[in-house]
Amino acid sequence: LLVAALASAAALLGPGGLAAQPAAGAAKTGINQNFIEPGEATKRQEEHNNYFLSKAAAEPAHILDLQTSPYALAERPAGLDYDTYSAIAYGLATSMMVVGPSTGVDGARRIIIIDTLEDASAARKAGADYLALYNRKYGAALTKLPIDAIIYTHNHIDHTGGVLGYLDMADKDACPIEDPSVAGADGAYVGRRNCVEIICQEGVTDAVVNTSTVSGQIIQARSIYMYGIKLDSGIGAASPPGSNIGKAITNGIGPFLSKGLSGYRMPSRTFTDQLDLSAAGVNMQVIYVPSETNDELAVFVPDAENGAAASVGKSGLLFSAEVVQGPAFPNLYSLRGTQYRSPETWYQSVDKLRNLDSWCMVPSHGPPVCQRKNIQLLLTNFHDAIQFTHDQTLRYMNMGYTPDELVEKVKVPDVVVEDLKTLVPWPNAPGNDSFQGPVHTEDYLIPFYGSVPQGVRETYFGYVGWYNADPVTLSPVPPTQAAERMIALVDSHKSVLEGARSALAGKSREDFQWAAELATILVRAHPDDMTARKIKADAFRKLGARAIDPNWSDWYFTAAKELDNPPGTCFINYLPAGLVSPVIQSRIPIADWVASWTWHLDGQKAAQEKAGMALGFWFEPTEQDFGSEGYILQLRHGIVEITDWQGTKADWLTHVDVALQMSQKVLDGLIIANSFFPGSVPPIESGKVTLLKGTKEDVKHFVGYFDGNPACEPALAVPRH
């Protein structure tokens, strides 16, 4: 009976990846292998940081100079009139500086910043080091950075979140925000000289809105697990090697995620497919390359248009963004949660880069890859790994295989990794000794960020959605009830507990996975069972110690820490920062902030009480959205309908029960101070917010239907009960 019950439990819970990866064994890693021996897994993560960290133990961050490196100079044509630098290990991403030939009235050469890191503090640190380098290299004594343009390669916070730090250090203000009526225009564009241009693809702001308001709260919580923010840091050399088990060692595409305050600045110029941009005297092709995000861009700097002889043909320098996602298998799906990433679109964008004659490729994560042979090898194998994952998933999907079955079938050929052993990356190149050690070249397709199983499941979901075609999944027994029935099936809680304990005492990864799955049944039925919680936590620690992918190991170890606490513990206090930073929320369009009220509504409560009030917001004057703006929030049938009012203020007032007016400057200040958010009453008594209609009690009654900010981030490792 017990054997039958446990088999039923396995069928109910799914294999959880049991057969998706080979059992732990030799230290050899491969594109399909996510687990190795515990000490070896930690050691490989430590060695992987050699892609990022400098050899100076006290200062892991450093700036790479493409003008002095023999590796970068090998195929660089003579006569180029711009210089390029790459700031590494200031955070998760890389921030690049291009020094152009154009000068200001002070004679200083103007610059372009590509990607801004994740927060203002990281950007200021990189900016200060760039300023010191600039003064040293160009014989200047500047106190501000001579920035003409900032380019976001895409919307993610580690590429946009530090923009306010750079703008604080710039010698002029940002250009006015682009008029939405003319957004997305392609063609030639010469950057203005009297302000800092903010350049990006037209979809960036919409994506920032999504992660800062729509899905930001849950993605923020999941990011804490994925990046190991609750774990002790294992950055730097360990003694002995491999002794950092349980710590956050690397983030795979960067050494760590900076924890400062993130911000945003809406762009001054966007494009759709290609922008021929001239800024700081540098002529660039800004190319749309949807891949890791649907708003990704790459920057190609043609040699012949930037000082080199015309005889060089169509060669140039490439800023590849995250089309090649650093030294790791691409994150075709991110564990923190993302909208669908099409693998087909991604490898097609890789092809766009393959078709460029690049002598050096500067990515937004990790060091540059220079010399045509290296670039083409990496791009080709990166393309092939993604296409194989995509095509073979479709092949088996069309045979009727489900996601759990697909991860057992789709195995990318090892040859795409083995080929990379001939690649020469920057840290291994002769004459480049700024990194803390040599690297494994095959890491560019080893699961240090994404993984094949993640990509397989995402591909299935993108084409046919969540339903696996077995009707048993249409209306399953609720999880808690299913767990209780499973325990009853084997006659006792104790039987399942002993099964979990026995599996935990095993030696294979499959044993530890099974222990975690059995313990999950117990914890789901009885969340206060600390013995079961401990077994599940210990199983996660054993799995985390063997996971080569830091996203996986950090999640295992963080989940174990959560399980160590009794039920009801606030494991992670809610903090309005990161993706949901109030600074970011204050910089998005007003309409999007108002729209965020809709998913904070307690629909059941509003429907039961037949709530039908209408609240009006009037913002006057506005700064970033061109004119006064009025909105109506109408409660009805457990939803709140938002109307963007197009009529007069007087007519608007007749359509609402309660009306509030404030300037955009006041709204932004209240958001930044965390004094006004969905579910809260604005400080009417301050005099900055005017109550045009209704009473303060009416306002309280209306906002009482909405959730305020939570006290804690949602628990993720403990099943809902």
Please give the residue ranges for each predicted region:
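Accessory terminal helices/loops
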Residues: 22-60, 207, 211-257, 354-360, ...
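Conserved beta-strand hairpin/beta-sheet module of binuclear metal-dependent hydrolase folds
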Residues: 67-142, 298-300, 305-322
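Signal peptide processing junction and immediate N-terminal pro/mature segment
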Residues: 12-25
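Bacterial N-terminal signal peptides
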Residues: 2-14
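Feature captures hydrophobic
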Residues: 499-502, 508-517, 521-524, 528, ...
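Active-site metal-binding motif and surrounding structural segment of the metallo-beta-lactamase
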Residues: 65-66, 101-109, 120-197
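Metallo-beta-lactamase
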Residues: 65, 79, 109-121, 182-186, 190-195, 259, 263-265, 274-278, ...
